[in-house]
């Protein structure tokens, strides 16, 4: 490269470049690529100014040879190539005589005709990228930027190229020649890559064929190819003025950055409409369990055996009747379905050997409830593609629903402690290393805080139901199988307990795709009278099935017992996630662990024990209309767990959208609280994106109302 520079450039340029490098403590013999780049840049600056003069009338003219006596003044003052002190002297004198604003960085030229400084760039990369980097660095509206590349591309501020076509062509030809010369000596690759500091061996994932054509078609405006866009993105410097960047990206974009102040955000608008209804796959706070302690009956652990045993603990059966019909359904069919379950359970018991599974008779009421033969017949596309008015069904927009108080009660209930433990302490071997000791100590404390939590019961109940339903869906596709809803726990005294919540009857389940739906009817015991909050139960038909004797202060009193029956559906992918709801536990453990780590690093010792045992300390749990709620570490664990579990139980596209979009607003508000002076553009569009997700989902509506409480307190 050194030889190449010596042979290709004017000795004066080579000398100036050597001087410039030494001024910055760099060695031209070692940093040969940089040496060549500086020479090239100097030569372009000189060529830019060559032959350009201003005549006595102040017009710009080009004189290549001619009368040496003509009264001509050089159009450009060359600043590049002078030593720093001299260069700044020239800049200062120009500013003093012309009144032009003094630049922060040394420019390359001054144009006496346009009265502006010029920054010349020569790049081996994309001109866009280099232009942006220059613009970001100098951050001055007044300095004109003109970038040339070795491939003949150029870019200048406001597409004002200063010079005539021919002068620019001369520069481009010279750059192209330098590139050819370097390439012929095998120097070009190293030179090209050195600007970017990338590896010489370049491995790229090649995109070809259709994908390549699609990629080229889908580029933003002003990009000719995918490479060109890739390079632009790779070189994008994150700091700097957003407006400028946006206006360079596209002529159509003009973003006004608005300051985000305490008065800027408004609360989210929650929808009006009838109150929202319960949409979980099984009852939560309203569930009633029929339980057996220390089960030791024959076939213990086989769901059907366990269920029959649990049913026997209830003595208050009555003739069932409908007390809250389903608005749209054929309610007598739900009643008949329950009677059929009772009758078929009786049949099972009467058999000599109880079977492990029970398939229900395909009665008219079950066929109706499970939507048998209701699906429209599928026709091969080939047979109907010529139909002229082929179209998809019109589907109705979902009806907006308002937030109802029951979902907050459900959440509060999920945070509470029950009197049973729902997860076992893992059987883990002896600790070997000190870190393992800390880890198992944390896990034990954590387990103690959450093992009795109602949210943990919901996890185990969900895992059981989804596993059983997925199994049955694969093993008995055509059968209406009866699936008991069971969970297991330990009492305070450590006794094992098996609980029955009710039954599921599954419909036909030929599930080819992840999203194919299996319909099921759920029948769940409850002591909740549905007439207290009828809107919560609009999807259910509720029967009264008996009376349960409950201990009260004055002895035992009968309480009416209800059965919530509804048709529901799920899919393989939903059951897969339902089976993995236990993942909420490690997810939460990580959150708690980062809190402990933060404490420990402040105190410079492990704070696990103090963290869990210091009962006087309170932690922020969340924001309510009353302000920031605080509680013990156990309460924090249980609240975070309940949130995580509800995200799983009430998973929906509305929740996905709300979480993603509201997070952006949350980050902006946090930045404001941290005095980072955030700015936004199109805040209205962000609000629209958030509010588009607030339709009818109870959990999303509750989160939105919490978000509003947070906004109120955060901006006080």
From Swiss-Prot:
User: According to the record, how does the cofactor bind?
Assistant: Binds 2 manganese ions per subunit.
Its PTM note reads: Phosphorylated on serines and threonines by host kinases, including human casein kinase II.
Q: Tell me the organism.
A: Influenza A virus (strain A/Mallard/New York/6750/1978 H2N2)
Motif Nuclear localization signal 1 (NLS1): residue span? 124-139
* Cystine connections: none
What biological process terms from GO does the record include?
A: cap snatching; DNA-templated transcription; symbiont-mediated suppression of host gene expression; symbiont-mediated suppression of host mRNA transcription via inhibition of RNA polymerase II activity; viral RNA genome replication; viral translational frameshifting
Name this protein carries in UniProt = Polymerase acidic protein
Query: What are the required cofactors?
Result: Mn(2+)
Oligomeric state and interaction partners are given as:
Influenza RNA polymerase is composed of three subunits: PB1, PB2 and PA. Interacts (via C-terminus) with PB1 (via N-terminus).
Q: Which GO terms describe its cellular component?
A: host cell cytoplasm; host cell nucleus
The encoding gene is PA
């Amino acid at each position: 490269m050194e030889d190449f520079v010596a042979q290709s450039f004017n000795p004066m340029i080579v000398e100036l470049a050597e001087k410039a490098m030494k001024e910055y403590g760099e060695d031209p013999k070692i940093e040969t690529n940089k040496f060549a780049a500086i020479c090239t840049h100097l030569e372009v600056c000189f060529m830019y100014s060559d032959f350009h003069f201003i005549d006595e009338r102040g017009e710009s003219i080009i004189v290549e040879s001619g009368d040496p006596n003509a009264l001509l003044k050089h159009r450009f003052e060359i600043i590049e190539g002078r030593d720093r002190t001299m260069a700044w002297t020239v800049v200062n004198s120009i500013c003093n005589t012309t009144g032009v604003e003094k630049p922060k960085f040394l420019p390359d030229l001054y144009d006496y005709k346009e009265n502006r400084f010029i920054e010349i760039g020569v790049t081996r990369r994309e001109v866009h990228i280099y232009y942006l980097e220059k613009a970001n660095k100098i951050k001055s509206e007044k300095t004109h930027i003109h970038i040339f590349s070795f491939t003949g591309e150029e870019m200048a501020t406001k597409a004002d190229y200063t010079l005539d076509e021919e002068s620019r062509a001369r520069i481009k030809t010279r750059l192209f020649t330098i590139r050819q010369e370097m390439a012929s000596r095998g120097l070009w690759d190293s030179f090209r890559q050195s600007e970017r500091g990338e590896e010489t061996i370049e491995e790229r994932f090649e995109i070809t064929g259709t994908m390549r054509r699609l990629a080229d078609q889908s580029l933003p405006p002003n990009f000719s190819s995918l490479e060109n866009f890739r390079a632009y993105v790779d070189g994008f410097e994150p700091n700097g003025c957003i407006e400028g960047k946006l206006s360079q990206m596209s002529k159509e974009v003009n973003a006004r950055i608005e300051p985000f102040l305490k008065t800027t955000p408004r609360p989210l608008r929650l929808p009006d409409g009838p109150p929202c209804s319960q949409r979980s796959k099984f009852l939560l706070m309203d569930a009633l369990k029929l339980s057996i302690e220390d089960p030791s009956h024959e076939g213990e652990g086989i769901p059907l055996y366990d269920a029959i045993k649990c049913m026997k603990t209830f003595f208050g059966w009555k003739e069932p009747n409908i007390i809250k019909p389903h608005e749209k359904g054929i309610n007598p069919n739900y009643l008949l379905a329950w009677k059929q379950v009772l009758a078929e359970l009786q049949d099972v018991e009467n058999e000599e050997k109880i079977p492990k599974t029970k398939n229900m008779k395909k009665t008219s009421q079950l066929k109706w409830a499970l939507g048998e033969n209701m699906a429209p017949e599928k026709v091969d596309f080939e047979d109907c593609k010529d139909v002229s008015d082929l179209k998809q069904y019109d589907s109705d927009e979902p009806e907006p629903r308002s937030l109802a108080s029951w979902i907050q009660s459900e959440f509060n209930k999920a945070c509470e402690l029950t009197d049973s433990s729902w997860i076992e302490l893992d059987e883990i071997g002896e600790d070997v290393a000190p870190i393992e000791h800390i880890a198992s100590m944390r896990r034990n404390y954590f387990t103690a805080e959450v093992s009795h939590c109602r949210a943990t019961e919901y996890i185990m109940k969900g895992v059981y139901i989804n596993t059983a339903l997925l199994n049955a869906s694969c093993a008995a596709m055509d059968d209406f199988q009866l699936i008991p809803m069971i969970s297991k726990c330990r009492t305070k005294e450590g006794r094992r307990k098996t609980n029955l919540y009710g039954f599921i009857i599954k419909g036909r389940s030929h599930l080819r795709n992840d999203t194919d739906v299996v319909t099921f009817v759920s029948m769940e015991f409850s002591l909740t009278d549905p007439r207290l909050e009828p809107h919560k139960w609009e999807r259910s038909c509720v029967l009264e099935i008996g009376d349960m004797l409950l201990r009260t202060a004055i002895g035992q009193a009968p309480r009416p017992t209800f059965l919530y029956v509804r048709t529901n559906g799920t899919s393989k992918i939903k059951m897969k996630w339902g089976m993995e709801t236990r993942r909420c536990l490690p997810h939460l453990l990580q959150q708690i662990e980062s809190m402990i780590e933060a404490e420990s690093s402040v105190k410079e010792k492990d704070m696990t024990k103090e963290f869990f045992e210091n009962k006087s300390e309170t932690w922020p749990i969340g924001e309510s209309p009353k302000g920031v709620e605080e509680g013990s570490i156990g309460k924090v664990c249980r609240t975070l767990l309940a949130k995580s579990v509800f995200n799983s139980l009430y998973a929906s596209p509305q929740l996905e959208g709300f979480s993603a979009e509201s997070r952006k607003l949350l980050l902006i508000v946090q930045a404001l609280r941290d005095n980072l002076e955030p700015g936004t553009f199109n805040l209205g569009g962000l609000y629209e994106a958030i509010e588009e997700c607030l339709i009818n989902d109870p959990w999303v509506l509750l989160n939105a109302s919490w978000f509003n409480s947070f906004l109120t307190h955060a901006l006080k």
